[in-house]
Amino acid sequence: MIELTKVTKLYGTVIGVNEIDLVLEPGAYGLLGANGSGKTTLINLLTGQLKPSVGAVRIFQSDPWAESNVRYRLGLCPATDILYTNVTAFQFVRFLLELQGINRLDSAELANNALDVVGLDDKDRNRPMGEYSRGMKQRAKLAQAIAHDPELLILDEPFSGLDPVARHEMTTFLQDWVTSGKSVVVSSHILHEVENIAQHYLLMNHGRLLAHGSTTEIRDLLADIPREVTLRCTDAVKLAGVLQYQECVESVGVLDGNLGVIVRSTDANSLFDALPNWITEHELNVTEVESSDESLNWIFDTLLKMHQGEI
């Protein structure tokens, strides 16, 4: 679906993205990184709005910069609110469909269908967009992105500025989109916004792609990084005494109130494999196990620290 080969984009002497090699099959992807990490530049390359300075971009085996036909297979919901204030959402979506060569009658039907899907009722879709709230503007942008039924939907910071209700509605829509078998790339600088949508993640920092894959695949990149595991139990001192002699344990600390221990392990998988036997053998009552790497935030924060030489 997406293939990038040694892609670099320069803005004068400034590097937008740097030597990205990437192959993505159809599916749902979260594009993650801080503001200025290169996410929007990458999206503009994928959608044919920018030409790479070096390397090649292929979407459905075509060059989106040079081959306009492939762009009909894409839907883009941009981050910016560049909307005509005196135009209604219906007029906006219909006009963009007409630009694709769809006749006026069919474009009107497709526009109304898309506006139905995103939840803009008859009254709101026929009001000037200058009167819209941020959430309504996002719905209008989303409607134009899906009206032509694209194979790949790309959204740049779609949750930005939305209230909790609108965020929930956006999440539900994207979950339904993925469930229907269509592909999506969702850009965000906030991890939890895409956790309920994407199965695979791409992490960018300073124009570079630090890692990509499923949560499990990315976690495997950190196999040699010590992790903290919290074990809650009824006798923390006894548990600490057992753990301190194990090869996979680097250190053990007892929680306040003797309610459990914090274990620092260089091989968390071995720790988890052996733990049931230790509990049985020493008659320990462990009530809860919690690992730091259960959080995607921890995984991505750790990758960033590795890239910056802090680990």
Model-derived segments and spans:
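Conserved ABC ATPase signature
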Residues: 128-135
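Helix-to-loop junction immediately C-terminal to a conserved catalytic motif
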Residues: 47
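Conserved ABC transporter NBD signature motif
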Residues: 55-70
